[in-house]
Amino acid sequence: MSFISLSVRRSILAPRLRPTATLARAYTTAKVDIKALKKLRTLNPVAMSKAKEALLSCDNDITRALAWLEEDALKAGAKKADKVKDRVASEGAVSVFVNESLTAATIVELGCETDFVARNASFVDLAAEIAQAGMGFASTSAEGAVLAGIEAHDLAAKMLDGRTVSDTITETIGRLGENIVLRRAAVVGAPSAAESIVVSGYVHGSVKGSAGGSAGKIGGLVAVTSSIKSDAHRSTLSQLTRRLAQQVVGYGPRFTTMEEYQKAGEQAEAPDAVVLEEQQFLFGGGSVKEVLAKISKEIGAPVEILSFVRYERGEGVEKADKPDFAEEVRQQLA
């Protein structure tokens, strides 16, 4: 039996090992630029490993790496969204946005699965940003300034920081791990109607997001119409609409006037329970109708409630049975 010396064996094996060694050396020579890594994570605070992967895939080009991260997050979100799409989103948040001139406003309800996510800063900011995006549906004339619903699929197609609302929701699903649904939205007022409309909103149980947005459990909008002749008039009406929005959120009326109440037919509740003008004003001074009459006399022009809307999170959604702790953990890890 013959033996092959160690040196001979090495000479035979060496050619086979060289390709692997070459590949290893090529891999290790691809290094992440530390300055680029720091800047990338400042612009997009992802995990260190994900930031490194993005830079290695993009030759340390920060602009390309940012795009890579966005695409990666969207893919991860789409995958997660497909897994959780059948879960009931009975929690969530309501957010309102009122423009600076107080002539138009929007309200949205964004649904999620748990109160924990509903209070998450990213979720709150998303709801607030979507409400702002809804301003694109505001009427361009005072004649069309009445309350109008916004179709969820139309709002989902609106752009939000370079991406559609739909894609932003999908990416957020990937990060937060819950089903997120844009349930409903509405807009009232007209940005150009500064001489005839004042709008205000209010959110109860408001939570602040990290980017300055806010959202809560119940929200409301109120728009009044009048002949506005001065800044003092507008200031008076601004305070009125703000208080009326609080009234709507707190008392939950379903009609504006007695005429609307009577047209709806027989009602189980008394008018002063469900008709906004017949309710006692939350801040005193008689009924809402009486307060409107007093302010009309004060500014020398009739003041009327144009419209109002009230959203409560999870309204009309049947809540699923809460899973036991172990099942809840499994769902979060799915």
Residue ranges with predicted function:
Residues 2-5, 23, 27-334:
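N-terminal assembly/interaction segments in proteins that build large macromolecular machines
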Residues 1-17:
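N-terminal chloroplast transit peptides
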